[in-house]
Amino acid sequence: MVMGGLLAGGGYVGACLFVAVHPTTVNVGHRPIQPVPFSHKIHAGQLKLDCRYCHNTVDRAAHAAIPPTATCGNCHGGNLVTEDKRALSNIHIASKKLEPVRSSLETDESIDWIRVHDLPDFVYFNHSAHVTRGVSCVHCHGRVDQMEVVSQVHTLSMKF
């Protein structure tokens, strides 16, 4: 019985160490090239858009949603019209950088964004549990509102 407890305890410690050194947990500086160059510095910084405008599930779901292209279309949709006949805004509609957004809006195919802050599949983390208790986005993600290109600035190890 004691031996079983030692083995289980050792397995738990091993799993914790594995998570603590897993590349996606400690990947400080991770800065993938996204399919659309998106400036959080402009959107969250200069324009003062709340994180939840795009990441709208962060306070009620386990995961902070990567926004659907329709969210981009609210401002960058151009001549497109929604199902309820609302015309979408036309901010920077001629920009070549937004071609994938326009294409996605027209075809209804998602943009393949690359997660910057990504935990291993075996780790359960609930964003809403932290956000609803007052943990700010900045605490884990850094000053994203000052980043032209988002990068991971802290380890995601929770420092146990």
What is the predicted role of each segment?
Residues 1-17:
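Hydrophobic membrane-insertion alpha-helices, especially the h-region
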Residues 70, 79-123:
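Primarily the internal scaffold of c-type cytochrome electron-transfer domains
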Residues 7-11, 22-26, 43-46, 94-99, ...:
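N-terminal start-of-chain detector that recognizes signal peptides
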Residues 1-4, 62, 97:
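Short intrinsically disordered, low-complexity coil segments enriched in acidic
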Residues 14-32:
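Aromatic-capped interface at the extracytoplasmic side
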Residues 22, 31-82, 123-160:
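Sequence context surrounding c-type heme c attachment/ligation sites in exported
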